[in-house]
A protein has these predicted regions:
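Alpha-helix/helix-capping structural signal
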Residues: 83, 137-138, 209, 248
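Cyclic nucleotide-binding regulatory domains
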Residues: 66-128
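Short aromatic/basic micro-patch
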Residues: 59, 102, 133, 205, ...
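Phosphate-/nucleic-acid-contacting segments
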Residues: 189-265
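Cyclic-nucleotide recognition modules
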Residues: 101-166
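Polybasic "coupling" helices that flank or enter modular domains
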Residues: 144-216
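Cyclic nucleotide-binding regulatory module and flanking cytosolic helices
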Residues: 5-64, 108-109, 114-115
Length: 265
């Protein structure tokens, strides 16, 4: 197996070039989580799973707060997140950031690269993250050959759009406490669907600054709202660990209805 160190101008990381002949059993399992996700979106056949596992890919690991994709870059690959958390964000000409989504293992956060030639957003790690880069043309070819896989990828894109619509509502119309509570509920629900643990207790990977940039608030306001949620008795916080003590009440505070997730991870 070939290992090289590659500097893309953003950071230096290990690039493992993988092909079918030298793929290990561990490498072959790289797509297990994303396959499980896609199976919830369409009734995949064994041939669909085999086609996904046969895709060429490169494994990369990046530290926190580093760009995987920069807005305007050529869109040649699709990123399958294996471990860790990343966010999508846009920035104004003056450098102000708006986080537009969070992503977790099993997600393909830049699936639009199947058809779009340029990235229209930034993709940045929140934690250390490991991901597989799949050439977009190879994934597009397999999707054209496997209708059920194409259906699953299309549904994933539609659910992504549904989540975007909910985020617009969250930032535009909910009060500060509801925004924070809603973000926590969504994160917990998506983690559970992704098989990452129960929704009632989790480690929150986002900083208060990142939460602020996702909810249109300041870090100070986020901190105050987290304290209020704890004072209300709906969450217990221990540094990064969050426990939702009353899920039904938390959902009422958040105005949270998981229907917009369409049972997606």
């Amino acid at each position: 197996m070939l290992e090289t160190y590659t500097d893309f101008g953003f950071y230096c990381f290990i690039d493992r070039l993988v092909d079918e002949e030298n793929m290990t059993a561990n490498d072959n399992d790289a797509f297990t989580r994303v396959i499980h996700k896609l199976e919830r979106l369409a009734p995949l056949e064994q041939a669909d799973r085999d086609a996904i596992r046969a895709l060429p890919f490169r494994i990369k690991t990046a530290p926190p707060n580093h760009y995987l994709v920069k807005e305007g870059a050529a869109a040649t690959d699709c990123c399958v997140l294996l471990t860790g958390y990343v966010c999508r964000h846009k920035t104004t000409s003056s450098g102000d950031r708006q986080i537009v989504s969070f992503h977790m293992p099993g997600d393909i956060p830049d699936l639009q690269h199947l058809l779009l030639s340029r990235a229209d957003h930034n993709l940045e790690t929140i934690t250390e993250a490991t991901f597989a880069l799949v050439p977009a043309e190879d994934l597009r070819r397999v999707a054209q050959q496997r209708p059920l896989l194409a259906e699953a990828l299309w549904r994933d894109t539609l659910i992504d759009a549904s989540i975007f619509r909910e985020w617009v509502l969250n930032v535009g119309r909910r009060d500060a406490k509801s925004r924070i509570a809603h973000m926590l509920c969504e994160f917990a629900a998506r983690r559970e669907k992704a098989g990452l643990g129960p929704p009632e207790r989790f480690n929150l990977p986002m900083t208060q600054e990142q939460i602020a940039d996702a909810t249109g608030l300041t870090s100070v306001h986020v901190n105050r709202m987290l304290f209020e949620l704890a004072a209300d008795g709906v969450i217990v916080r221990d540094k990064r660990q969050v426990e939702i003590t009353d899920w039904s009440r938390m959902c009422r505070v958040a105005d949270f209805n998981a229907a917009y997730l369409h049972e997606a991870a």
